[in-house]
């Protein structure tokens, strides 16, 4: 859908949405997301210009349907897919992408670390109408025997190749600096970010500063030529509750704020990644800290997980934290699956993670009174009161699961219009009883008030 929009920008040195927004231009992408978000196009332009909203939309990704990530937009969720060094299957990753699209992921990240990484990414990009993100350091590592052998030139080459292929946003771990590494020494779990650990290993081996940091200006030049959005990686994020909100985390966050403003000087869009594992009571403070240090750039958080004791259920432990984070200003939530800390997610894990995070994001949108956020809740509630089971399934986040649960005990089609479920049966359904009471009260009022020539009162039931 974007081919004609993109064609008009050929030959321009900076094609980023921020550049156009600061020039006073409402791009087609801005107008498109304004309609999706029920916002005025001028407000979208102003938010992109200010840096509080990003529209990840590489000009080499014409298949993309643009979306907005920012405090004035609905909360978005990201789903991670991609192979590991021990499993490599393009068809399986495309199947995961289809699950992401079916269940409503807003963006997807290809975190492949093995096999033909560019080929896998190309297949995902060409099949994806949603923004695609990557972590370039993973592909960089595939080109060398040891992380110490990485060169800034190779890293820039890989970044440019991914940008030219159409990647919409990239996680760049530029805030992990040499001086910060000792700050993580006291932690229970140390450095848990793969990208953060790799950069720390490189710096210690080469006795040099992080090349993503020293070559940040060159990365900005690449990004503005393709309109790639920075997702500034939190390489020192806490990996357990005990490590949350420590000196290492906040030293890096301050550096990410400085890098955010440097990218903005180039007219490049930025979002900032956040923790991690954080006790529930510390989440609001963490959101406020990011706004303060990073000049209100959109915050993209992984969870956070609010307890460490539930392997196999970390889609739940993290969705709890994600809902609180989103209520307090997080713009995008990176999903966590039941396989977190245990292994590579399969398709069922992907589905469960997406649904858990759609719930978290939606709950936050309702709490923040986003335009139209509660419409679907109200429609489903009306269908529930009317015993319209098929409408309830249709309106649910996961219609297949909702229908399957109902079918477990009442599988026949006749029960899809029954005024009860298997929990209460026909005699104990509270809504059915209330409906009969409402009808009786209305009939009594009509008879009494009709005889007296008065308007009916009594028990009122909304449709």
From Swiss-Prot:
This is Phosphomethylpyrimidine synthase. Pathway: Cofactor biosynthesis; thiamine diphosphate biosynthesis. Belongs to the ThiC family. It catalyses: 5-amino-1-(5-phospho-beta-D-ribosyl)imidazole + S-adenosyl-L-methionine = 4-amino-2-methyl-5-(phosphooxymethyl)pyrimidine + CO + 5'-deoxyadenosine + formate + L-methionine + 3 H(+). Keywords: 4Fe-4S, Iron, Iron-sulfur, Lyase, Metal-binding, S-adenosyl-L-methionine, Thiamine biosynthesis, Zinc. Homodimer. InterPro entries: ThiC, ThiC/Bza_core_dom, ThiC/BzaA/B. The keyword Nucleus does not apply. One of its GO terms (cellular component) is cytosol. GO terms for molecular function: 4 iron, 4 sulfur cluster binding; carbon-carbon lyase activity; zinc ion binding. Its EC number is 4.1.99.17. Zn(2+) binds at residues 277, 341. It comes from the Bacteria. HAMAP family: ThiC. Gene3D superfamilies: 6.10.250.620, Radical SAM ThiC family, central domain.
């Amino acid at each position: 859908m974007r081919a004609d929009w993109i064609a008009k920008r050929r030959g321009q040195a900076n094609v980023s949405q921020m550049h156009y927004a600061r020039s006073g231009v409402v791009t087609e992408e801005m107008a498109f997301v304004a309609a999706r978000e029920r916002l005025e196009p001028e407000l979208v332009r102003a938010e992109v210009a200010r840096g509080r909203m990003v529209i990840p939309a590489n000009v080499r990704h014409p298949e993309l349907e643009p979306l907005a990530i920012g405090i004035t937009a609905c909360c978005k969720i990201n789903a991670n897919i991609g192979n590991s060094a021990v499993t490599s299957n393009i068809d399986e990753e495309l199947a995961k992408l289809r699950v992401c699209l079916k269940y409503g992921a807003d963006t997807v990240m290809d975190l492949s670390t093995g096999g033909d990484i560019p080929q896998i990414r190309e297949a995902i990009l060409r099949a994806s109408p949603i923004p695609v993100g990557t972590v370039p350091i993973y592909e960089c590592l595939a080109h060398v025997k040891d992380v110490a052998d990485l060169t800034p030139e190779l890293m820039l080459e890989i970044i440019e190749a991914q940008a030219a292929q159409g990647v919409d946003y990239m996680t760049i771990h530029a805030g992990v600096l040499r001086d910060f590494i000792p700050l993580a020494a006291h932690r229970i779990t140390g450095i848990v970010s793969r990208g953060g650990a790799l950069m720390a290993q490189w710096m210690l081996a080469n006795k040099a500063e992080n090349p993503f940091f020293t070559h940040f200006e060159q990365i900005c030049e690449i990004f503005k030529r393709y309109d790639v959005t920075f997702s500034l990686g939190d390489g020192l994020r806490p990996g357990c509750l005990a490590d949350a909100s420590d000196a290492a985390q906040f030293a890096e966050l301050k550096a990410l704020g400085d890098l955010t403003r440097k990218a903005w000087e180039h007219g490049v869009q930025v979002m900032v990644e956040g923790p991690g594992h954080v006790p529930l009571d510390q989440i609001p403070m963490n959101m406020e800290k990011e706004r303060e240090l990073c000049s209100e750039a959109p915050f993209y958080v992984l969870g956070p997980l609010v307890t460490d004791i539930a392997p196999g259920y970390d889609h739940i432990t993290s969705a709890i934290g994600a809902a609180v984070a989103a209520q307090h200003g997080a713009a995008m939530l990176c999903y966590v699956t039941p396989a977190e800390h245990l292994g590579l997610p399969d398709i069922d894990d992907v589905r469960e993670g997406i649904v858990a995070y759609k719930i978290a994001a939606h709950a936050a949108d309702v709490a923040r009174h986003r335009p139209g956020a509660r419409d679907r809740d109200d429609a489903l509630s009306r269908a529930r009161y009317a015993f319209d089971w098929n409408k309830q399934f249709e309106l649910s986040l996961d219609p297949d699961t909702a229908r399957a649960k109902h079918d477990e005990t009442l599988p026949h089609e006749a029960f899809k219009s029954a005024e009860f479920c298997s929990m209460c049966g026909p005699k104990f359904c509270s809504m059915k009883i209330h409906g009969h009471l409402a009808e009786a009260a209305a009939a009594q009022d009509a008879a009494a008030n009709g005889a007296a020539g008065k308007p009916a009162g009594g028990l009122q039931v909304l449709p």
